[in-house]
Amino acid sequence: MNIDIVCVGKVKERYLRDAIDEYRKRLSRFAKVDVIEVADEKTPEHASDTLNAQIKEKEGERILKHLRDGAFVVALAIEGDQLTSEQLAARIAQWGLHGVSHLQFVIGGSLGLDPRVLRRANMPLSFSKMTFPHQLMRVILLEQIYRAFKINAHEPYHK
């Protein structure tokens, strides 16, 4: 299976880049995982709703350029479905059984995702009602994908 993490902005902190690299390495025996970063827009501290919508639209255009025809797209969004690790593992297994060979997870920028990206997604997924830094969310997502593959392989890791 091919998995892309399509995300807005670059990870600046070395410890987060190291964690991302570690989980990509661990996942390499299960899937080919690519992290695709699109440029983020500068967001003024007290931006108007109109400006925020324009920023999300620009970032959304960049994301949409990387979403592949035929890929199953999962958009991380606070209003998405909340799953346990076991449920995510079951979904990934089910998608594979139904012929999904390319899975794309989308992580928006600090303002979230443009509505067009959410409409393109096959499934919205929420990790929590809380807000997480989008750079950290990459690590959390990769860890959960790794955990899902370990669960599906009946290998020790998940407790």
Curated annotation (Swiss-Prot):
Gene3D superfamilies: 3.40.1280.10. PANTHER family: METHYLTRANSFERASE (PTHR33603), RIBOSOMAL RNA LARGE SUBUNIT METHYLTRANSFERASE H (PTHR33603:SF1). Pfam families: SPOUT_MTase. Keywords: Cytoplasm, Methyltransferase, rRNA processing, S-adenosyl-L-methionine, Transferase. Specifically methylates the pseudouridine at position 1915 (m3Psi1915) in 23S rRNA. Belongs to the RNA methyltransferase RlmH family. It is an enzyme of class 2 (transferase). It catalyses: pseudouridine(1915) in 23S rRNA + S-adenosyl-L-methionine = N(3)-methylpseudouridine(1915) in 23S rRNA + S-adenosyl-L-homocysteine + H(+). One of its GO terms (cellular component) is cytoplasm. The keyword Repressor does not apply. The gene is rlmH. It is found in: Cytoplasm. Its EC number is 2.1.1.177. S-adenosyl-L-methionine binds at residues 76, 108, 127-132. Homodimer. This is Ribosomal RNA large subunit methyltransferase H. GO terms for molecular function: rRNA (pseudouridine-N3-)-methyltransferase activity. InterPro entries: Alpha/beta_knot_MTases, RlmH-like, tRNA_m1G_MTases_N.
